[in-house]
Amino acid sequence: MRIRTLPTLAPLTLAVQAFMLAGSLSLSAGASAATAAAPSTRNVTWEDIANDHLTTKDVLQYGMGTNAQRWSPLAQVNDQNVFKLTPAWSYSFGDEKQRGQESQAIVSDGVVYVTGSYSRVFALDAKTGKRLWTYNHRLPDNIRPCCDVVNRGAAIYGDKIYFGTLDARLIALDKNTGKVVWNKKFGDHSAGYTMTGAPVLIKDKTSGKVLLIHGSSGDEFGVVGQLFARDPDTGEEVWMRPFVEGHMGRLNGKDSTPTGDVKAPSWPDDKTTETGKVEAWSHGGGAPWQSASFDAESNTIIVGAGNPGPWNTWARTSKDGNPHDFDSLYTSGQVGVDPSTGEVKWFYQHTPNDAWDFSGNNELVLFDYKGKDGKVVKATGHADRNGFFYVVDRNNGKLQNAFPFVDNITWASHIDLKTGRPVENEGQRPAKPLPGETKGKPVEVSPPFLGGKNWNPMAYSQDTGLFYIPGNQWKEEYWTEEVNYKKGSAYLGMGFRIKRMYDDHVGTLRAMDPSTGKLVWEHKEQLPLWAGVLATKGNLVFTGTGDGFFKAFDAKTGKELWKFQTGSGIVSPPITWEQDGEQYIGVTVGYGGAVPLWGGDMAELTKPVAQGGSFWVFKIPSWDNKSAQR
């Protein structure tokens, strides 16, 4: 097989060379004003969204379907002809607002809707890249994003586009004009509430109502994480569920039930406070900042809960107590939620009393798991920041399998399949500072808080039965610090410096068998991997790299088949769709995110990477389209 590649070039030079290769490259520059010229007129129905994982002409939901598998049945572009893939068009987001571009685009009725950094939305003609309209949200100065000014995507339903903002709003736009239909504030942005994840649509089987589901961000600033359900037509809240034990939920505008036990025994008592609980309980995190999956069969929303606040394990443990006695529910795990009421149906915790900021927000992929006994279980697949891959029964939250997907995990030896709990290694929870000192003794931990895999979503292939996991091999020095809550300030109580594990690589794209935990193949990258993954029926796996390459691999062997230099690092999930008989593949480009802000030695490693902001679309040239058919 032949590999087509381009050298590292400045973006303008790259665009010119790509034009010569493709013969059809359309470069479009963005503008800030909305323009009404969208060709999209057909409204999106729930049936469209429910079948998103089966259909090919649109991409309507984050994860490319409610199951979040990121697998496409398209095979026009395949392992035999992918070397012919060339740019169809590229759109520049424009102006100085670059930073991390982590958005997964959606596609409907010939229009690409892609969000950008600083809470922006662009509507583009899917065939030409022509700008149809732009929405620029006006952000206040006192926003508190923890991990860059990113936005991970939008949702679509009816005649509206929905997305969240860094000042804690959910906004509905007319999908044809970009004009605001409604705008709902859900939290105090000056206290750290933001929204970076893409909202999703689900249909409650009990009521028959379609609901718009979204979470909040802000664990690093001491928020209490909340999951919301809204009426997609009006934006009105239907219910809200907090993910810290003992905090009160809402249903139809009124207090409903507390999450778990109202006495919150998994958080220590403190008779000196107004609440009777330790300070951390009032600022306990658990924010579901990533997008939810939806199991229509069991009528369950399944979403990850974020890390507890603060990171410091001793702030969430009674004085002279044992952290293992205080699990900090309902944080750092996966939650099954009833869409009718917002009640918690089940909860599985990946990291009890999480001392390492492992969180639980990484995507939850719905798939059929076949165990060693041959029994098939409707399950979730989850590659956690803590370095372990989990298979959980999505009907009841019971653990089915767990195994490491990265090397040299130090904090735990394994996950006990009987108890479902990690078997921790001694000395990996950093000790309190000694009397008179402000900082505890550093401990070397792996994975570091940025995780064996972070938010960037993996893919599952229905053909190979493998998960394709974009992970990182690294470690950190980690130590405790004194911590007290102050509104709008970081609420961590930990210090850190991320370091290399290996000299020749950090990122690893790994294909793994969920039944056996076996590593089938891996591809190594010098820089951290922060892009998502796409798998297709064409025996292909696509992902992007920190140094700007968009790559395709053989799904069975891991052989690199094609790559293209986009001019800036890629930290987003790719998508694919079919239009007028041709397969298109798109990816958002622009380096940033958490690594250059929080990454220690890794931030130094990525300094040479250029920033950017653009959306690239690839296809096999139309004149060669016949040879692209299998």
Where are these regions (language model features)?
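Beta-propeller blade signature
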Residues: 173, 178, 225-236, 321-342, ...
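Blade-level signature of beta-propeller repeat domains, shared across WD40, Kelch, NHL, RCC1
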Residues: 575-630
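Repeat-blade elements of multi-bladed beta-propeller folds
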Residues: 59-63, 98-120, 145-169, 194-220, ...
